[in-house]
From Swiss-Prot:
The gene is atpI. It comes from the Eukaryota. This is ATP synthase subunit a, chloroplastic. The keyword Transmembrane helix applies. It is found in: Plastid, Chloroplast thylakoid membrane. Belongs to the ATPase A chain family. F-type ATPases have 2 components, CF(1) - the catalytic core - and CF(0) - the membrane proton channel. CF(1) has five subunits: alpha(3), beta(3), gamma(1), delta(1), epsilon(1). CF(0) has four main subunits: a, b, b' and c. GO terms for cellular component: chloroplast thylakoid membrane; plasma membrane; proton-transporting ATP synthase complex. Its main location: plastid. GO terms for molecular function: proton-transporting ATP synthase activity, rotational mechanism.
Protein backbone atom coordinates (compact mmCIF):
# COMPACT_ATOMS: atom_id res chain seq x y z
CA UNK A 1 0.00 0.00 0.00
CA UNK A 2 2.86 2.33 0.86
CA UNK A 3 4.50 1.48 -2.46
CA UNK A 4 1.27 2.27 -4.32
CA UNK A 5 0.89 5.57 -2.47
CA UNK A 6 4.51 6.49 -3.22
CA UNK A 7 4.02 5.64 -6.90
CA UNK A 8 0.91 7.82 -7.10
CA UNK A 9 2.76 10.72 -5.47
CA UNK A 10 5.63 10.28 -7.91
CA UNK A 11 3.26 10.30 -10.88
CA UNK A 12 1.59 13.45 -9.55
CA UNK A 13 5.03 15.07 -9.28
CA UNK A 14 5.85 14.09 -12.84
CA UNK A 15 2.52 15.53 -14.00
CA UNK A 16 3.40 18.84 -12.33
CA UNK A 17 6.76 18.78 -14.10
CA UNK A 18 5.03 18.26 -17.43
CA UNK A 19 3.24 21.55 -16.81
CA UNK A 20 6.50 23.49 -16.62
CA UNK A 21 6.67 25.51 -19.81
CA UNK A 22 9.85 26.85 -21.36
CA UNK A 23 9.78 29.64 -23.87
CA UNK A 24 6.71 31.68 -22.87
CA UNK A 25 7.44 35.38 -23.12
CA UNK A 26 5.89 38.62 -21.98
CA UNK A 27 6.19 41.49 -24.45
CA UNK A 28 5.73 45.24 -24.34
CA UNK A 29 4.54 46.91 -27.50
CA UNK A 30 6.40 50.19 -28.03
CA UNK A 31 5.51 51.88 -31.28
CA UNK A 32 5.59 49.22 -33.93
CA UNK A 33 8.04 47.01 -32.05
CA UNK A 34 7.67 44.13 -29.63
CA UNK A 35 10.07 44.46 -26.69
CA UNK A 36 10.97 41.40 -24.65
CA UNK A 37 9.86 42.68 -21.24
CA UNK A 38 11.08 39.75 -19.12
CA UNK A 39 14.69 40.20 -20.15
CA UNK A 40 14.57 43.98 -19.74
CA UNK A 41 13.04 43.82 -16.25
CA UNK A 42 15.49 41.28 -14.88
CA UNK A 43 18.46 42.93 -16.61
CA UNK A 44 17.53 46.29 -15.08
CA UNK A 45 17.35 44.67 -11.66
CA UNK A 46 20.83 43.19 -12.11
CA UNK A 47 22.22 46.53 -13.32
CA UNK A 48 20.68 48.35 -10.34
CA UNK A 49 22.24 45.79 -7.97
CA UNK A 50 25.67 46.24 -9.55
CA UNK A 51 25.54 50.04 -9.68
CA UNK A 52 24.04 50.34 -6.21
CA UNK A 53 26.66 48.04 -4.68
CA UNK A 54 29.51 49.91 -6.38
CA UNK A 55 28.21 53.36 -5.41
CA UNK A 56 27.56 52.45 -1.78
CA UNK A 57 30.94 50.72 -1.42
CA UNK A 58 33.34 53.11 -3.18
CA UNK A 59 31.64 56.51 -2.92
CA UNK A 60 33.88 57.33 0.05
CA UNK A 61 37.12 55.33 -0.39
CA UNK A 62 39.22 54.91 2.73
CA UNK A 63 42.99 54.78 3.13
CA UNK A 64 42.40 51.69 5.24
CA UNK A 65 39.85 49.85 3.09
CA UNK A 66 36.57 48.66 4.52
CA UNK A 67 35.40 45.11 3.94
CA UNK A 68 33.25 46.19 0.99
CA UNK A 69 36.07 48.21 -0.54
CA UNK A 70 38.45 45.29 -0.08
CA UNK A 71 35.97 43.02 -1.85
CA UNK A 72 35.63 45.30 -4.87
CA UNK A 73 39.40 45.84 -5.04
CA UNK A 74 39.87 42.07 -5.03
CA UNK A 75 37.37 41.69 -7.88
CA UNK A 76 39.15 44.42 -9.87
CA UNK A 77 42.52 42.76 -9.31
CA UNK A 78 41.10 39.40 -10.36
CA UNK A 79 39.64 40.85 -13.58
CA UNK A 80 42.92 42.62 -14.34
CA UNK A 81 44.81 39.35 -13.93
CA UNK A 82 42.41 37.53 -16.27
CA UNK A 83 42.65 40.33 -18.86
CA UNK A 84 46.44 40.52 -18.68
CA UNK A 85 46.85 36.75 -18.97
CA UNK A 86 44.65 36.51 -22.08
CA UNK A 87 45.31 39.83 -23.85
CA UNK A 88 48.90 40.63 -22.91
CA UNK A 89 50.56 43.92 -22.03
CA UNK A 90 47.93 45.99 -23.85
CA UNK A 91 45.18 44.71 -21.58
CA UNK A 92 44.52 48.03 -19.80
CA UNK A 93 41.81 49.53 -22.05
CA UNK A 94 39.90 46.23 -22.05
CA UNK A 95 39.60 45.75 -18.28
CA UNK A 96 36.29 47.70 -18.04
CA UNK A 97 34.74 45.65 -20.85
CA UNK A 98 35.87 42.27 -19.51
CA UNK A 99 34.90 43.31 -15.99
CA UNK A 100 31.44 44.40 -17.08
CA UNK A 101 30.87 41.10 -18.88
CA UNK A 102 32.03 39.06 -15.91
CA UNK A 103 30.06 40.95 -13.26
CA UNK A 104 26.85 41.17 -15.29
CA UNK A 105 26.89 37.45 -16.12
CA UNK A 106 27.92 36.47 -12.59
CA UNK A 107 25.16 38.47 -10.88
CA UNK A 108 22.62 37.44 -13.55
CA UNK A 109 23.41 33.76 -13.03
CA UNK A 110 23.22 34.00 -9.25
CA UNK A 111 20.00 36.00 -9.40
CA UNK A 112 18.28 32.98 -10.91
CA UNK A 113 18.92 31.02 -7.71
CA UNK A 114 18.85 33.72 -5.04
CA UNK A 115 16.15 36.20 -6.11
CA UNK A 116 12.47 35.18 -5.79
CA UNK A 117 11.57 36.07 -9.38
CA UNK A 118 8.52 33.81 -9.39
CA UNK A 119 6.61 35.85 -6.80
CA UNK A 120 6.23 38.57 -9.45
CA UNK A 121 3.32 37.50 -11.62
CA UNK A 122 3.20 38.37 -15.31
CA UNK A 123 0.35 38.01 -17.82
CA UNK A 124 2.46 35.49 -19.75
CA UNK A 125 5.54 33.54 -18.74
CA UNK A 126 7.57 34.26 -15.62
CA UNK A 127 10.70 36.14 -14.63
CA UNK A 128 14.02 34.31 -14.49
CA UNK A 129 17.73 35.08 -14.68
CA UNK A 130 18.60 37.29 -17.69
CA UNK A 131 21.10 34.69 -18.87
CA UNK A 132 18.30 32.13 -18.88
CA UNK A 133 17.12 33.77 -22.12
CA UNK A 134 18.87 33.21 -25.44
CA UNK A 135 18.36 36.88 -26.37
CA UNK A 136 20.66 37.99 -23.55
CA UNK A 137 23.43 35.50 -24.24
CA UNK A 138 23.39 36.21 -27.98
CA UNK A 139 23.58 39.95 -27.28
CA UNK A 140 26.57 39.44 -24.99
CA UNK A 141 28.26 37.23 -27.59
CA UNK A 142 27.67 39.80 -30.35
CA UNK A 143 29.16 42.52 -28.14
CA UNK A 144 32.21 40.30 -27.73
CA UNK A 145 32.43 39.82 -31.50
CA UNK A 146 32.26 43.57 -32.09
CA UNK A 147 34.94 44.05 -29.44
CA UNK A 148 37.45 41.65 -30.98
CA UNK A 149 36.85 42.99 -34.50
CA UNK A 150 37.42 46.50 -33.16
CA UNK A 151 40.56 45.40 -31.31
CA UNK A 152 42.02 43.83 -34.46
CA UNK A 153 41.13 46.73 -36.77
CA UNK A 154 42.38 49.38 -34.35
CA UNK A 155 45.70 47.54 -33.95
CA UNK A 156 46.34 46.51 -37.58
CA UNK A 157 43.95 48.49 -39.75
CA UNK A 158 42.73 46.74 -42.89
CA UNK A 159 45.70 44.40 -42.61
CA UNK A 160 43.66 42.62 -39.94
CA UNK A 161 41.68 40.86 -42.67
CA UNK A 162 44.89 39.23 -43.90
CA UNK A 163 44.45 36.64 -41.17
CA UNK A 164 41.66 35.03 -43.19
CA UNK A 165 44.12 33.81 -45.84
CA UNK A 166 46.76 32.58 -43.41
CA UNK A 167 48.54 30.23 -43.54
CA UNK A 168 47.03 29.52 -46.96
CA UNK A 169 44.14 31.09 -48.95
CA UNK A 170 42.51 27.65 -49.11
CA UNK A 171 41.49 28.12 -45.47
CA UNK A 172 39.54 31.33 -46.21
CA UNK A 173 36.05 29.74 -45.80
CA UNK A 174 37.07 27.99 -42.58
CA UNK A 175 38.61 31.14 -41.10
CA UNK A 176 35.46 33.12 -41.92
CA UNK A 177 33.28 30.39 -40.44
CA UNK A 178 35.35 30.48 -37.27
CA UNK A 179 34.31 34.07 -36.61
CA UNK A 180 30.66 33.00 -36.79
CA UNK A 181 31.11 30.00 -34.52
CA UNK A 182 32.77 32.01 -31.73
CA UNK A 183 29.67 34.02 -30.76
CA UNK A 184 27.47 30.96 -31.31
CA UNK A 185 29.53 28.83 -28.95
CA UNK A 186 29.69 31.60 -26.33
CA UNK A 187 25.95 32.26 -26.37
CA UNK A 188 24.70 28.66 -26.49
CA UNK A 189 27.15 27.45 -23.84
CA UNK A 190 26.03 30.08 -21.34
CA UNK A 191 22.33 29.79 -22.20
CA UNK A 192 22.32 25.99 -22.10
CA UNK A 193 24.08 25.71 -18.76
CA UNK A 194 21.92 28.28 -16.97
CA UNK A 195 18.66 26.99 -18.43
CA UNK A 196 19.57 23.39 -17.60
CA UNK A 197 20.50 24.32 -14.03
CA UNK A 198 17.16 26.06 -13.42
CA UNK A 199 15.18 23.22 -15.01
CA UNK A 200 16.97 20.62 -12.86
CA UNK A 201 16.09 22.59 -9.72
CA UNK A 202 12.43 22.86 -10.82
CA UNK A 203 12.25 19.10 -11.45
CA UNK A 204 13.85 18.18 -8.13
CA UNK A 205 11.68 20.61 -6.18
CA UNK A 206 8.60 19.01 -7.75
CA UNK A 207 9.75 15.49 -6.83
CA UNK A 208 11.53 15.97 -3.48
CA UNK A 209 10.72 19.49 -2.32
CA UNK A 210 12.53 19.55 1.03
CA UNK A 211 15.89 17.75 0.78
CA UNK A 212 17.49 17.18 -2.61
CA UNK A 213 17.25 20.70 -4.17
CA UNK A 214 19.48 22.35 -1.54
CA UNK A 215 22.84 20.76 -2.54
CA UNK A 216 21.82 21.05 -6.20
CA UNK A 217 21.23 24.78 -5.71
CA UNK A 218 24.69 25.17 -4.16
CA UNK A 219 26.16 23.29 -7.10
CA UNK A 220 24.22 25.62 -9.41
CA UNK A 221 25.72 28.67 -7.71
CA UNK A 222 29.20 27.24 -8.20
CA UNK A 223 28.67 26.40 -11.87
CA UNK A 224 27.07 29.81 -12.45
CA UNK A 225 30.24 31.49 -11.25
CA UNK A 226 32.35 29.19 -13.42
CA UNK A 227 30.24 30.04 -16.49
CA UNK A 228 30.76 33.76 -15.90
CA UNK A 229 34.51 33.20 -15.63
CA UNK A 230 34.59 31.05 -18.79
CA UNK A 231 32.68 33.65 -20.81
CA UNK A 232 34.89 36.53 -19.65
CA UNK A 233 38.10 34.52 -20.16
CA UNK A 234 37.13 33.46 -23.69
CA UNK A 235 36.11 37.04 -24.55
CA UNK A 236 39.52 38.28 -23.40
CA UNK A 237 41.25 35.46 -25.29
CA UNK A 238 39.44 36.35 -28.53
CA UNK A 239 40.40 40.00 -28.13
CA UNK A 240 44.02 39.08 -27.48
CA UNK A 241 44.01 36.73 -30.47
CA UNK A 242 42.68 39.43 -32.80
CA UNK A 243 45.38 41.84 -31.64
CA UNK A 244 48.17 39.30 -32.01
CA UNK A 245 46.89 37.69 -35.20
CA UNK A 246 47.50 34.08 -34.27
CA UNK A 247 45.11 31.16 -33.72
Amino acid sequence: MNVLSYSINTLEGLYEISGVEVGQHFYWKIGGFQVHAQVLITSWVVIVILLGSAIVTVRNPQTIPTDGQNFFEYILEFIRDVSKTQIGEEYGPWVPFIGTLFLFIFVSNWSGALLPWKIIELPHGELAAPTNDINTTVALALLTSIAYFYAGLSKKGLGYFGKYIQPTPILLPINILEDFTKPLSLSFRLFGNILADELVVVVLVSLVPSVVPIPVMFLGLFTSGIQALIFATLAAAYIGESMEGHH
